[in-house]
């Protein structure tokens, strides 16, 4: 399984498990692994809906400036 962690609005979101359920497919999320997807996220119709935001919040692992993402990956995944 590919690890998929993206950045939206300066927060990391671990979408590894969610990726297979994403309506646009896993491939588009993988493209943004460890990259800022804020602009693309905001361009997609419906992404601003409270339901989508609420679902996304479930996968938030921390603010970019406050988390060592490499350490997070090592602690949560066998790589």
What are these regions (language model features)?
Residues 1-79:
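Histidine-anchored, small-residue-rich loop motif
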């Amino acid at each position: 399984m590919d690890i998929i962690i993206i950045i939206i609005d300066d927060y990391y979101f671990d979408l590894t498990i969610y990726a297979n359920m994403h309506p646009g497919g896993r491939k588009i999320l993988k493209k943004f692994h460890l990259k800022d997807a804020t602009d693309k996220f905001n361009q997609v119709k419906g992404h601003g809906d409270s339901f989508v935001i609420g679902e996304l919040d479930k996968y938030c692992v921390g603010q970019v400036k406050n988390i060592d993402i490499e350490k997070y990956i090592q602690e949560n995944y066998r790589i």
